[in-house]
A protein has these predicted regions:
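Short, function-defining helix-loop hinge/capping sites that tune catalysis or transport
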Residues: 31, 69, 105-106, 133, ...
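Single-residue recognition of alpha-helix boundary sites
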Residues: 34, 108-109, 136, 199, ...
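Flexible, membrane-associating and regulatory peripheral segments of lipid-active enzymes
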Residues: 1-93, 107, 116, 295-299
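Short, amphipathic alpha-helical "lid/cap" segments that border enzyme active or binding sites
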Residues: 63, 137-141, 269-277
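Helical cap/lid subdomain of alpha/beta-hydrolase-fold lipid enzymes
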Residues: 173-299
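Serine-dependent carboxylesterase/thioesterase catalytic core
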Residues: 94-104, 110-225, 241
Length: 299
């Protein structure tokens, strides 16, 4: 028993150490990019957060990364799809994780939504590493078809984190009017790419998220997605994974910039949750615009 406790403690310490090392790498890379491209970053607003705020964002991001690493076993849980309740008109909400992540990322956000009355929430898995975003989009389509069919719903809403937003966009673009997606809310999605791993060549998914990649060019070409679904992009000026952070801006969508939050911290933020809840509950579509500081689009 004592040996198992020691192994568990070593595992926890290893996850915490790995989380800290990854974030040191990411934040140093983001700072290096700011130094190399100061005019663009200043124009994009990435230097508006004072250094104490960035230091706090780093500490919270380390904690969020470690917490999600420890939550990995919970990703094995599966929620059964249920028919819609006649007295609840809201569509099912599908939660889509990002690169190298898992469905358990949404445990906190899903619990808050359940507490506020959402009954049909489904965190789905897709290929987290070593795959292809468009192939993941096809698998997502099969999952959404099953959710709509079993729930008896004509549409679903999607809340996607990081790369999950690109998977959702690829799916909606491929299916067009038949996608059945009413609203797409993305959190920290690199809509215009990210330069966090400029020299990493082992995983093709990372290459697909580089600025100017063939995939991003296809998604951006006469992008029909904002016309097919209500699109809201929530991104942080202090995101060290989406580099520069302004690449979280999604042309054609309603964009909300927040500050003082890292990439994974977006999933635990009360400010971000309030935006997600309000935008899921709102009835009319947002106009393409940008709201600074976290103001939701008007009802």
């Amino acid at each position: 028993m004592a040996a198992l406790a020691h192994i568990a403690m070593l595992l926890v310490l290893g996850i915490v150490a790995a989380s800290a090392l990854f974030n040191v790498y990411a934040y140093r890379g983001a700072a290096r990019h700011r130094r190399r491209h100061p005019p663009a970053c200043a124009a994009d607003g990435e230097d508006r957060t004072p250094w104490p705020g960035r230091a706090w964002a780093f500490a919270v991001e380390c904690a969020a990364t470690a917490l999600l690493g420890l939550a990995t076993p919970l990703a094995l849980r599966r929620r059964r799809v249920r028919p819609l309740d006649p007295d609840d008109p809201r569509p099912p909400v599908v939660l889509l994780h990002g690169y190298a992540q898992h469905p358990a990322n949404f445990l906190w956000l899903a619990r808050r939504l359940e507490r506020d009355g959402w009954r049909h929430l489904y965190a789905v898995a897709h290929t987290p590493v070593g795959g292809d975003i468009e192939r993941s989009a096809r698998r997502l389509g099969e999952t959404l078809d099953r959710v709509r069919r079993t729930a008896g719903a004509s549409r679903v809403d999607i809340v996607a984190h990081s790369m999950g937003g690109l998977v959702a966009r690829a799916y909606i673009r491929a299916r067009g009017q038949a996608s059945g997606v009413g609203r797409l809310i993305t959190l920290g999605t690199p809509h215009q790419g990210t330069e966090i791993f400029p020299r990493f060549r082992l995983d093709p998914m990372v290459g697909q998220m580089r600025p100017g990649s063939p995939l991003l060019a296809r998604l951006a070409a006469d992008d029909p997605v904002p016309r097919l679904a209500d699109c809201i992009s929530i991104y942080s000026a202090d995101d060290a994974v989406v580099v520069p952070a302004s690449r979280g801006y999604y042309p054609g969508a309603f964009n909300v910039e927040v500050r003082g939050l890292g990439h994974l911290s977006l999933l635990f933020s009360r400010r971000v949750y309030a935006l997600v809840r309000e935008n899921l509950a709102a009835e009319r579509a947002p106009a393409p615009a940008t709201a600074a500081g976290g103001a939701p689009w008007p009802r």
